[in-house]
Amino acid sequence: MLKVYANVIHPGKGLADALRPLCHEAVSTDGGDNSVTEKDGMVLLSFVGIYFPWEEAAGAIRSHITKDSTGKMDVLDMENWRITRFFIKDGTVTSRSGSLNNALDYNGF
């Protein structure tokens, strides 16, 4: 099972439109709240399910950020007990991965 959550503040134009098709490719669980929303200058992504093309989502985010964009995307792989966090800051996207046992280490770095 995967859980993917993202928030991008001040994204470049078109980010939500780039992420929405990825939700349609995803394989979710029954009752999963899978959505991409735009609100008050922020794009939010929420997914819970079996498969989500998170590498493509990271690529879409990289393609649609500006120097003013900030935020993060968390990919929680429950089967392999891993977390990957993408950091969005200063026009770049970086990431770190580790065990979910150390998830608190990923809160803020």
Predicted regions and their residues:
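Charged interaction segments
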Residues: L22-F109
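Short, extreme N-terminal segment that most often corresponds to the first beta-strand
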Residues: M1-A26
